[in-house]
Amino acid sequence: MALKNFNPITPSLRALVQVDKTSVWKGRPFKSLTKGISKTGGRNNHGRITSWHRGGGHKKLYRIIDFKRNKIDISAVVERIEYDPNRTAFIALIKYEDGQYSYILAPQKLSVGDKVISSQDADIKIGNCLPLKFIPIGTTVHNVEMKVGKGGQIARSAGTSVDLVGKDSGYAQIKLRSGEFRLIPLDCKATIGSISNPDQKNINLGKAGRNRWLGWRPHVRGVAMNPVDHPHGGGEGKTSGGRHPVTPWGFPTKGKKTRKNKRTSKFIVKKRK
């Protein structure tokens, strides 16, 4: 996919850069693989804000994606590549030999008419899904499971992938884009290739309103608030905040390590950069 620039007939078009979607399906999604999704506005079941700066946005249908790839040894043909408003990657509608349809994450260079399969005997080909024990070292993969049968959780965003760098004692060692090296059980599945739409990182929304369409509200700085609202608030005139950056609840932010998951730390061979 290429990037698309616009003739600046309005101020917002001057900066706008989008991904060219001319090769993506322009019709409606496959109806039986969609369901309604309700908005939360960033609120939990008590009505309290748990995710700031969320709200509004265009109405969306949720596309049911097959992250597990549990239909074993049955090949499928790619019917079309589609845009999905719920994620940055494109998705592929596939039709199995038995007539069943499914959505999967579309890897780069997957085309309409290509055949994909989930099998331990599958070829090392873009879109095929195999257990890590049957994938050669050095292969680039995506949609990697962390627990057997749970479905892919690692490398699902646009342009992402991980590298399989080793196998030992029942675990595969993978290298993530962050620089982290992690151990994954060899029976976990992964899909060959990198996720589609790598140019997503180069887009420019062009105006604040486009962010509102995506469901994001204005991000107010702490120094622009009153003391009752934020530790950085208040002061006479414009201030720097007067202290190291903190969250609204007083915890250090902007680079402070917050990971507290000792249970899975044993699976991290090397921490991210």
From Swiss-Prot:
Residues 254-273 have a biased composition (Basic residues). InterPro entries: NA-bd_OB-fold, Rib_uL2_dom2, Ribosomal_uL2, Ribosomal_uL2_bac/org-type, Ribosomal_uL2_C, Ribosomal_uL2_CS, Ribosomal_uL2_dom3, Ribosomal_uL2_RNA-bd_dom. The keyword Repeat does not apply. SUPFAM superfamilies: Nucleic acid-binding proteins, Translation proteins SH3-like domain. GO terms for cellular component: large ribosomal subunit. One of its GO terms (biological process) is translation. SMART domains: Ribosomal_L2, Ribosomal_L2_C. PROSITE patterns: RIBOSOMAL_L2. One of the primary rRNA binding proteins. Required for association of the 30S and 50S subunits to form the 70S ribosome, for tRNA binding and peptide bond formation. It has been suggested to have peptidyltransferase activity; this is somewhat controversial. Makes several contacts with the 16S rRNA in the 70S ribosome. Part of the 50S ribosomal subunit. Forms a bridge to the 30S subunit in the 70S ribosome. This is Large ribosomal subunit protein uL2. It comes from Rickettsia canadensis (strain McKiel).
